[in-house]
Amino acid sequence: MAADGQCSLPASWRPVTLTHVEYPAGDLSGHLLAYLSLGPVFVIVGFVTLIIFKRELHTISFLGGLALNEGVNWLIKNVIQEPRPCGGPHTAVGTKYGMPSSHSQFMWFFSVYSFLFLYLRMHQTNNARFLDLLWRHVLSLGLLAAAFLVSYSRVYLLYHTWSQVLYGGIAGGLMAVAWFIFTQEVLTPLFPRIAAWPISEFFLIRDTSLIPNVLWFEYTVTRAEARNRQRKLGTKLQ
């Protein structure tokens, strides 16, 4: 809180552009799309939460791929140097260049990689039931819809042109395929060794790459352990 007599303003103020999205005043569609365009921020928050509570190497690798994807986007933008549409009506943006769209590239990387993970990484389970397959299909459609809506929001809100979000989506999809192959062929064989490092054991970092359906595995193990402890507690009370 500023004290009396300390309200002299600096020469200029700069906003935090990470979550700063502008939309036309009174435009309900633009208001909704402005929130949807924050999809990458929500994804990052989700990843940080998963890593803190799960500490799984594949999740950490996935986040590393997203970070690399952002670095590639920054490099391409500064090489091509194509301006944003309409003379750049938004002043609070991270960079004045718009080719390719970082939001589009981020979301399509996330969606394509998740799609590959669901259908290739989790295909090993032999007891896939109808509901399991339905869950994968619905989740995949949701991921693709989210990527499209975020890309569309950047065009609607005049942050990018259609070509900028299109090439961003292509770049993100290609990066996702490349990183998925690299993770499966190079990193995954190293995960057991990395998980055995003393520092990994100290931070409880684990490798679940050999478990085809982690969700089902955690459910069954937790249920079995809970029943076992309940029986022991019942025996003590008798």
Swiss-Prot record:
GO terms for cellular component: endoplasmic reticulum membrane. Pathway: Protein modification; protein glycosylation. It is found in: Endoplasmic reticulum membrane. Pfam families: PAP2. Belongs to the dolichyldiphosphatase family. Required for efficient N-glycosylation. Necessary for maintaining optimal levels of dolichol-linked oligosaccharides. Hydrolyzes dolichyl pyrophosphate at a very high rate and dolichyl monophosphate at a much lower rate. Does not act on phosphatidate. This is Dolichyldiphosphatase 1.
